[in-house]
Swiss-Prot record:
Disulfide bonds: none annotated. The keyword Chaperone does not apply. Plays an essential role in transcription initiation and cap-stealing mechanism, in which cellular capped pre-mRNAs are used to generate primers for viral transcription. Recognizes and binds the 7-methylguanosine-containing cap of the target pre-RNA which is subsequently cleaved after 10-13 nucleotides by the viral protein PA. Plays a role in the initiation of the viral genome replication and modulates the activity of the ribonucleoprotein (RNP) complex. Belongs to the influenza viruses PB2 family. The record marks K627 as: Mammalian adaptation. GO terms for molecular function: RNA binding; RNA-directed RNA polymerase activity. A motif (Nuclear localization signal) lies at residues 736-739. This is Polymerase basic protein 2.
Amino acid sequence: MERIKELRNLMSQSRTREILTKTTVDHMAIIKKYTSGRQEKNPSLRMKWMMAMKYPITADKRITEMVPERNEQGQTLWSKMSDAGSDRVMVSPLAVTWWNRNGPVTNTVHYPKVYKTYFDKVERLKHGTFGPVHFRNQVKIRRRVDINPGHADLSAKEAQDVIMEVVFPNEVGARILTSESQLTITKEKKEELQDCKISPLMVAYMLERELVRKTRFLPVAGGTSSMYIEVLHLTQGTCWEQMYTPGGEVRNDDVDQSLIIAARNIVRRAAVSADPLASLLEMCHSTQIGGTRMVDILRQNPTEEQAVDICKAAMGLRISSSFSFGGFTFKRTSGSSIKREEEVLTGNLQTLKIRVHEGYEEFTMVGKRATAILRKATRRLVQLIVSGRDEQSIAEAIIVAMVFSQEDCMIKAVRGDLNFVNRANQRLNPMHQLLRHFQKDAKVLFQNWGIEHIDSVMGMVGVLPDMTPSTEMSMRGIRVSKMGVDEYSSTERVVVSIDRFLRVRDQRGNVLLSPEEVSETQGTERLTITYSSSMMWEINGPESVLVNTYQWIIRNWETVKIQWSQNPTMLYNKMEFEPFQSLVPKAIRGQYSGFVRTLFQQMRDVLGTFDTTQIIKLLPFAAAPPKQSRMQFSSLTVNVRGSGMRILVRGNSPVFNYNKTTKRLTILGKDAGTLIEDPDESTSGVESAVLRGFLILGKEDRRYGPALSINELSNLAKGEKANVLIGQGDVVLVMKRKRDSSILTDSQTATKRIRMAIN
């Protein structure tokens, strides 16, 4: 206050004012400071000072022809004095107002297209809803977040090539547009920006915003998707938060969210198959997310999540070097350890073989709702500083850290046997056994941990075994802090290896990820996920398995038909029939299979009994290992819609209904596709197999390879011989005629010859 009075006093003297306004600044150091380099040293002062002048703006000389000297109010818009040191005109801010109101209007059609990201943002904010402001302590942790909603996921190099091609198509320089997304975007943008008058540089900048993911390491307390980050300044302060619901979606957030769901589903499914790694790759390659191949998204998308990283590792991509345990991401910040196998006894005297980490290490632990700093020595927790959203989240972090510490008192706190299994019914490894055990109930663990007196430290409190805070006492080594622990900021990626059981290791052999770490949380994807792999048919339940199995048979009928007659065992072992088995009651699977296989064999043996519809209907039942029995069935049961439903061996049922006139197949009332029966199959006359342009030589001859379908015959050269499958599931040897003139006679001779060849 005194200082202000003193200053006021000084300013009231005219001499002070004169010194401050008239004296030149001639101290070289000061002049240097404010004039060297292009960077403005005091932007706000500069702005205020400029705006206090009459003509703070300079413009090209042409302005004098386009803007009048005075506006309607008679105010001067530009000065006749030219700008010192350039041939530009000095202009008043009023000229800008005049121009905005009265200047020429250009074609605005390109503005929403070029400035798409801004227009979209306005729409999102217009439709977003802001809720009440709450005052409370904000636990913010720095996370790497996407700050640029609505972008495609191109790499900087890919985007650069697209931008050059769109904005400067005639510039020299090799541009290689290879990826699907590059080509699509280039084509789209070239069409949109035809005859665009906006400066090319501006267009290039705006395109970059649209094409490339920009990330920043920012303190965040709430949602981390880009739609929340764009309003970060409105939704969280140091001591307040404002609720916000975004208006609309942005493609990149939807891709990230759907990718995580797809990856989790795929890893969970692969883990229970016979060869997890091969299955995982097959599924990643055959899945699409929002119409884009999942493998393409994985290559471009930097999302770090356990399941996503397992998929990336399987594809040979680099991933972050941090590891995952109990749903927390651990990053070692100092220290080192060596691993040694050790046998320990639980409180129930069960022997566990654990890999002990010997040595002092420090880690940061970052989870969805809690973060911590952990310092540990060999089988001893030295200190854990944890912060989280609520008591529950803090407890989760403490349990994970206690198990990770491998302390003896933790192992002795186990009550009862440890026999947790994964989805494939295999026992979990000891560390995950312990984790699951204490996640179910940590009472004994916390009670046995031990308690200590604590000194009061700013921003830290103790926590008792029942999770109540205390300033006097705390569980040994454990404190709760008001401050969050920042996520690991580096974007460094390392080369990793993955084994058959989807365990991901770094170059030193440390396990970074395993299927046990994949979250069980279910969510609804925002973009359509299309799993083409039969392994994922069961994700939408039994009905989906049923429909998909039959659709697959119909789509591949030409090849299925050949295998049915030539190599049935190979057909029965196809993985596409695997999901179907879960629908057939376990006790009777084998009998059904034996019955159907026998029936099929009779069809192969007895001329004229081949029945497309029946083969399709019964084929999935033949895939189970058959039990030989004399049982005959008139209907087969499948478990769908919560109960057993019947498929009739002869004739239609609600489950499997084939309409002969429309040739449509419906499964449980859902359309499953059109079935093309072999011509004249109903009359089972040999004429259905008449092959115009081919001479029938006799019975099948294995030397000429596997049987072709009638459609494949067209590829034969004249005079070439081949085995061919004809309407009744019979195979004959044919030769393509050398002359076309004799085609007419084929119909007469074929009938006789087929009869001879078969009998």
